[in-house]
């Protein structure tokens, strides 16, 4: 790195930090912290334990954001001053040190940028994820199972917990349908970037002629909502079906109709759960999924209205990413317009950078 490149990098990082400050609004957050301190000083604050806990969580999140921003601000301010002095005094040793530390500074600003991108109220929620293979039988069902494994590995890498809600194995290979919850801080904030159609191009292992096949799978992600958000579901708007839960190869898990499928008639949203032997528990989980899907549905309508576009009724959404294994290897995301060559690592769950690039690109746009 030379003096010109470093100077341009500093300009970019200062611009990024100013944008972060504009989005984060530290003054407003500090004002809210003062309000919380006053509330905590009240004698009857702990009489309402639920509210006190909620405020405590809010306080910790605000402190986390401010600490991260202040660290980045202090670091960049100090670097600006040091660079100005070193340049004026032609201190090559100090300049060389700054060049060497450029990557660390860049990563610090990017980390701060990401934390701001995940500042929406729902971002900290758990993520309810459903994967549905497209047309194409075994080939698409196998692709759905590859995506499922990719997300399980990503959750494992981030020390997130996974709760399986529904799993329907494919007839020959792969899966017909899977729904699960990824539990952890900002799980939804990250996983919302996976909402959409995922396209795979490869030489099919199920084709004796070894021809190249294109497969599609839909990934639907919604935040797990708590009881504070009231989603009204009227009986007349839903149809509930029960059926026997089955395992891989059509093996019955039990002989009672414990599996639940709920159809929300006005929107066409369908959820199902068969993971538990108890029909009652499956029904509770299915309603949880439905409420989250309806909440996400309304959010999407609001976003579409704000952007001046009509919300698509197509549950398949839009193609967001292509995974090409043949004739070359590349994963390319259409939103960030960035291609990645580490295909094997990505399919093994190394998707955090790819998601962060999407978050930055979509927020910048």
UniProtKB/Swiss-Prot annotation:
Localization terms from the record: Cytoplasm
Subcellular location, principal: cytoplasm
GO molecular function, one term: translation release factor activity, codon specific
Mod. after translation: Methylated by PrmC. Methylation increases the termination efficiency of RF2.
GO cellular component, one term: cytoplasm
Pfam families per record: PCRF, RF-1
Keywords: Cytoplasm, Methylation, Protein biosynthesis
Top-rank taxon, per record: Bacteria
Record function comment: Peptide chain release factor 2 directs the termination of translation in response to the peptide chain termination codons UGA and UAA.
Membership in a protein family: Belongs to the prokaryotic/mitochondrial release factor family.
Protein name: Peptide chain release factor 2
Organism: Aliarcobacter butzleri (strain RM4018)
């Amino acid at each position: 790195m030379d003096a010109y490149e470093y100077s341009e990098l500093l300009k970019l990082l200062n611009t990024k930090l100013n944008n972060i400050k504009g989005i984060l609004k530290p003054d407003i957050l500090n004002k809210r912290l003062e309000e919380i301190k006053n509330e905590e000083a009240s004698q009857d604050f702990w009489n309402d334990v639920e509210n006190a806990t909620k405020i405590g969580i809010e306080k910790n999140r605000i402190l986390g954001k401010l600490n991260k921003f202040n660290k980045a601000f202090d670091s960049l301010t100090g670097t600006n001053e040091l660079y100005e002095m070193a340049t004026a005094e032609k201190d090559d040793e100090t300049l060389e040190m700054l060049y060497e530390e450029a990557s660390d500074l860049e990563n610090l600003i990017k980390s701060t940028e990401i934390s701001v991108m995940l500042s929406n109220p729902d971002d900290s929620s758990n993520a309810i994820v459903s994967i549905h293979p497209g047309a194409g039988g075994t080939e698409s069902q196998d692709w759905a199972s590859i995506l499922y494994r990719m997300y399980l590995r990503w959750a494992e890498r981030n020390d997130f917990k996974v709760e399986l809600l529904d799993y329907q194995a494919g007839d020959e290979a792969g899966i017909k349908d899977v729904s699960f919850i990824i539990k952890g801080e900002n799980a939804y904030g990250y996983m919302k970037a996976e909402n959409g159609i995922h396209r795979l191009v490869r030489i099919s292992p199920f084709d004796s002629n070894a021809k190249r096949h294109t497969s599609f799978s839909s990934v639907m992600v919604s935040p797990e909502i708590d009881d504070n958000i009231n989603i009204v579901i009227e009986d007349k708007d839903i149809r509930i079906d029960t059926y026997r839960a089955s395992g891989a190869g059509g093996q019955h898990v039990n002989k009672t109709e414990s599996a639940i499928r709920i159809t929300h008639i006005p929107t066409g949203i369908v959820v199902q759960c068969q993971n538990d032997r108890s029909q009652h528990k499956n029904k509770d989980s299915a309603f949880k999924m439905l409420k989250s899907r309806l909440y996400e549905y309304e959010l999407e309508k609001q976003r579409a209205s704000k952007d001046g576009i009509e919300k698509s009724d197509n549950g398949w959404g839009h193609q967001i990413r292509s995974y090409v294994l043949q004739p070359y290897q590349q994963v390319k995301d259409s939103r960030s317009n960035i291609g990645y060559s580490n295909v094997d690592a990505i399919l093994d769950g190394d998707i955090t950078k790819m998601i962060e690039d999407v978050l930055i690109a979509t927020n910048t746009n």
